[in-house]
Amino acid sequence: VQAYALSAETVEPVSAVAEENCISGSWKRASDPALTEKVRKVFDKAFEGLEGVSYMPVALLASRTTGSGIQYRILCKATVVVPGAQEEYVVVTLQRGWLGKAEILDIGDPLCLTNLDHEEGAVGAWQEAESPAMTEEATAAFNKATVGFVGVDYVPVALLSTQTVAGTNYRILCEATTVYPGAEMHYAVVNVYESLEGNANIISVTDEYVS
Protein backbone atom coordinates (compact mmCIF):
# COMPACT_ATOMS: atom_id res chain seq x y z
CA VAL A 1 0.00 0.00 0.00
CA GLN A 2 1.41 3.38 -0.89
CA ALA A 3 1.87 5.89 1.90
CA TYR A 4 1.39 9.62 1.68
CA ALA A 5 2.13 12.48 4.06
CA LEU A 6 -0.96 13.94 5.67
CA SER A 7 -1.78 17.58 5.16
CA ALA A 8 -3.85 19.32 7.83
CA GLU A 9 -5.71 21.25 5.15
CA THR A 10 -6.91 18.09 3.39
CA VAL A 11 -8.08 16.06 6.37
CA GLU A 12 -11.85 15.93 6.40
CA PRO A 13 -14.51 13.67 7.93
CA VAL A 14 -15.17 10.52 5.91
CA SER A 15 -18.62 8.96 5.79
CA ALA A 16 -19.09 5.77 7.83
CA VAL A 17 -15.74 6.17 9.59
CA ALA A 18 -15.40 6.64 13.34
CA GLU A 19 -12.71 9.24 14.09
CA GLU A 20 -11.81 7.63 17.40
CA ASN A 21 -11.24 4.17 15.90
CA CYS A 22 -7.74 4.66 14.55
CA ILE A 23 -6.06 1.53 13.16
CA SER A 24 -2.45 2.45 12.39
CA GLY A 25 -1.01 5.64 11.01
CA SER A 26 -3.92 7.58 9.58
CA TRP A 27 -6.18 4.63 8.74
CA LYS A 28 -9.53 4.79 10.50
CA ARG A 29 -11.70 1.73 11.00
CA ALA A 30 -15.17 2.00 9.46
CA SER A 31 -17.81 2.37 12.16
CA ASP A 32 -20.23 0.61 9.79
CA PRO A 33 -18.79 -1.93 7.32
CA ALA A 34 -21.81 -1.70 5.01
CA LEU A 35 -20.81 -0.35 1.59
CA THR A 36 -22.17 3.10 0.80
CA GLU A 37 -23.21 4.14 -2.71
CA LYS A 38 -20.22 6.50 -2.80
CA VAL A 39 -17.74 3.72 -2.03
CA ARG A 40 -19.41 1.36 -4.52
CA LYS A 41 -18.99 3.98 -7.26
CA VAL A 42 -15.28 4.33 -6.46
CA PHE A 43 -14.95 0.54 -6.55
CA ASP A 44 -16.75 0.21 -9.89
CA LYS A 45 -14.63 2.95 -11.49
CA ALA A 46 -11.36 1.52 -10.18
CA PHE A 47 -12.09 -2.02 -11.42
CA GLU A 48 -13.69 -1.03 -14.72
CA GLY A 49 -12.09 -2.98 -17.57
CA LEU A 50 -10.09 -5.31 -15.31
CA GLU A 51 -9.96 -8.81 -16.77
CA GLY A 52 -8.87 -12.21 -15.52
CA VAL A 53 -10.31 -12.01 -12.00
CA SER A 54 -13.82 -11.09 -10.90
CA TYR A 55 -14.02 -8.92 -7.76
CA MET A 56 -17.18 -8.31 -5.76
CA PRO A 57 -17.07 -5.83 -2.83
CA VAL A 58 -18.32 -7.14 0.51
CA ALA A 59 -17.45 -4.64 3.23
CA LEU A 60 -15.74 -1.30 3.88
CA LEU A 61 -12.97 -1.91 6.40
CA ALA A 62 -11.18 1.42 6.77
CA SER A 63 -10.37 4.70 5.07
CA ARG A 64 -7.96 7.60 5.31
CA THR A 65 -7.59 11.04 3.82
CA THR A 66 -4.22 11.83 2.23
CA GLY A 67 -2.73 14.60 0.18
CA SER A 68 -3.61 12.62 -2.97
CA GLY A 69 -7.20 11.73 -2.14
CA ILE A 70 -9.31 9.40 -0.02
CA GLN A 71 -8.16 5.80 0.27
CA TYR A 72 -10.38 2.83 1.11
CA ARG A 73 -9.68 -0.70 2.29
CA ILE A 74 -12.44 -2.98 1.02
CA LEU A 75 -13.00 -6.69 1.57
CA CYS A 76 -13.90 -8.46 -1.68
CA LYS A 77 -14.84 -11.87 -2.97
CA ALA A 78 -12.43 -12.72 -5.78
CA THR A 79 -12.71 -15.46 -8.38
CA VAL A 80 -10.23 -16.17 -11.17
CA VAL A 81 -12.14 -16.35 -14.46
CA VAL A 82 -11.37 -19.98 -15.30
CA PRO A 83 -13.58 -23.09 -15.05
CA GLY A 84 -13.69 -24.55 -11.54
CA ALA A 85 -12.04 -21.56 -9.84
CA GLN A 86 -12.83 -21.16 -6.15
CA GLU A 87 -13.98 -17.91 -4.58
CA GLU A 88 -11.62 -16.26 -2.07
CA TYR A 89 -11.68 -13.29 0.28
CA VAL A 90 -9.12 -10.56 -0.44
CA VAL A 91 -8.59 -7.01 0.83
CA VAL A 92 -8.05 -4.32 -1.80
CA THR A 93 -6.92 -0.74 -1.32
CA LEU A 94 -8.44 1.91 -3.59
CA GLN A 95 -8.01 5.65 -3.96
CA ARG A 96 -10.38 8.35 -5.13
CA GLY A 97 -8.20 11.29 -6.14
CA TRP A 98 -9.22 14.88 -5.53
CA LEU A 99 -9.97 15.23 -9.25
CA GLY A 100 -12.24 12.18 -9.18
CA LYS A 101 -9.89 9.53 -10.58
CA ALA A 102 -10.40 6.09 -9.02
CA GLU A 103 -7.52 3.63 -8.98
CA ILE A 104 -6.35 0.38 -7.41
CA LEU A 105 -3.40 0.86 -5.05
CA ASP A 106 -3.06 -2.69 -3.77
CA ILE A 107 -4.65 -6.14 -3.99
CA GLY A 108 -3.74 -8.25 -0.99
CA ASP A 109 -3.00 -11.96 -0.84
CA PRO A 110 -6.04 -14.24 -0.43
CA LEU A 111 -7.22 -14.52 3.16
CA CYS A 112 -9.11 -17.80 2.69
CA LEU A 113 -11.75 -19.49 0.55
CA THR A 114 -15.27 -18.17 1.07
CA ASN A 115 -16.76 -21.70 1.10
CA LEU A 116 -20.15 -20.10 0.48
CA ASP A 117 -23.11 -22.11 -0.72
CA HIS A 118 -25.23 -19.76 -2.78
CA GLU A 119 -28.23 -22.09 -2.68
CA GLU A 120 -30.54 -20.45 -0.16
CA GLY A 121 -31.42 -22.63 2.82
CA ALA A 122 -28.82 -25.32 2.09
CA VAL A 123 -28.46 -27.45 5.24
CA GLY A 124 -25.03 -27.39 6.88
CA ALA A 125 -23.61 -24.90 4.36
CA TRP A 126 -21.91 -21.56 4.92
CA GLN A 127 -24.48 -18.85 4.23
CA GLU A 128 -23.37 -15.28 3.53
CA ALA A 129 -24.39 -12.78 6.20
CA GLU A 130 -27.22 -10.44 5.18
CA SER A 131 -25.06 -7.54 6.37
CA PRO A 132 -21.34 -7.37 7.21
CA ALA A 133 -22.17 -5.58 10.48
CA MET A 134 -21.51 -7.76 13.52
CA THR A 135 -24.73 -9.07 15.07
CA GLU A 136 -25.29 -9.27 18.82
CA GLU A 137 -25.17 -13.07 18.62
CA ALA A 138 -21.90 -13.13 16.66
CA THR A 139 -20.33 -10.55 18.97
CA ALA A 140 -21.34 -12.49 22.08
CA ALA A 141 -19.97 -15.75 20.67
CA PHE A 142 -16.71 -14.06 19.63
CA ASN A 143 -16.24 -12.47 23.05
CA LYS A 144 -16.80 -15.79 24.83
CA ALA A 145 -14.46 -17.63 22.46
CA THR A 146 -11.60 -15.15 22.93
CA VAL A 147 -11.72 -14.83 26.73
CA GLY A 148 -8.19 -15.45 28.00
CA PHE A 149 -6.75 -15.64 24.48
CA VAL A 150 -3.17 -14.33 24.48
CA GLY A 151 -0.47 -13.68 21.88
CA VAL A 152 -2.60 -11.95 19.26
CA ASP A 153 -5.16 -9.19 19.71
CA TYR A 154 -8.23 -9.81 17.53
CA VAL A 155 -10.79 -7.07 16.90
CA PRO A 156 -13.91 -8.18 14.96
CA VAL A 157 -14.79 -5.85 12.08
CA ALA A 158 -17.20 -7.78 9.82
CA LEU A 159 -19.44 -10.84 9.93
CA LEU A 160 -18.86 -12.81 6.73
CA SER A 161 -21.03 -15.90 7.01
CA THR A 162 -22.68 -18.40 9.34
CA GLN A 163 -23.12 -22.16 9.32
CA THR A 164 -25.82 -24.05 11.20
CA VAL A 165 -24.52 -27.29 12.70
CA ALA A 166 -25.17 -28.65 16.22
CA GLY A 167 -24.97 -25.02 17.18
CA THR A 168 -23.65 -22.20 15.00
CA ASN A 169 -20.34 -21.43 13.32
CA TYR A 170 -19.48 -17.78 12.69
CA ARG A 171 -16.87 -16.65 10.15
CA ILE A 172 -15.60 -13.23 11.22
CA LEU A 173 -13.06 -10.87 9.67
CA CYS A 174 -10.81 -9.35 12.32
CA GLU A 175 -8.01 -6.87 12.69
CA ALA A 176 -5.19 -8.98 14.12
CA THR A 177 -2.12 -7.60 15.88
CA THR A 178 0.57 -9.76 17.45
CA VAL A 179 1.19 -8.59 21.00
CA TYR A 180 4.69 -7.17 20.83
CA PRO A 181 6.09 -3.63 20.43
CA GLY A 182 5.91 -2.29 16.89
CA ALA A 183 3.73 -5.10 15.51
CA GLU A 184 1.64 -4.12 12.51
CA MET A 185 -2.03 -4.91 12.13
CA HIS A 186 -3.13 -7.38 9.47
CA TYR A 187 -6.50 -8.91 8.64
CA ALA A 188 -7.42 -12.45 9.66
CA VAL A 189 -10.52 -14.59 9.30
CA VAL A 190 -11.58 -16.22 12.58
CA ASN A 191 -14.02 -19.14 12.70
CA VAL A 192 -15.95 -19.33 15.98
CA TYR A 193 -18.21 -22.20 17.09
CA GLU A 194 -21.03 -21.70 19.59
CA SER A 195 -22.75 -24.80 20.93
CA LEU A 196 -26.46 -25.16 21.65
CA GLU A 197 -25.57 -24.76 25.34
CA GLY A 198 -23.98 -21.38 24.65
CA ASN A 199 -20.33 -22.38 24.98
CA ALA A 200 -18.00 -20.89 22.36
CA ASN A 201 -14.48 -21.50 21.11
CA ILE A 202 -12.23 -20.63 18.18
CA ILE A 203 -12.18 -23.36 15.51
CA SER A 204 -9.53 -21.87 13.24
CA VAL A 205 -7.77 -18.65 12.30
CA THR A 206 -6.22 -17.75 8.95
CA ASP A 207 -4.05 -14.70 8.40
CA GLU A 208 -3.32 -12.74 5.21
CA TYR A 209 -0.54 -15.09 4.16
CA VAL A 210 -2.66 -18.24 4.24
CA SER A 211 -5.05 -19.20 1.44
Give the ranges of each region predicted by the language model.
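N- and C-terminal low-complexity/disordered segments
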Residues: V1-S211
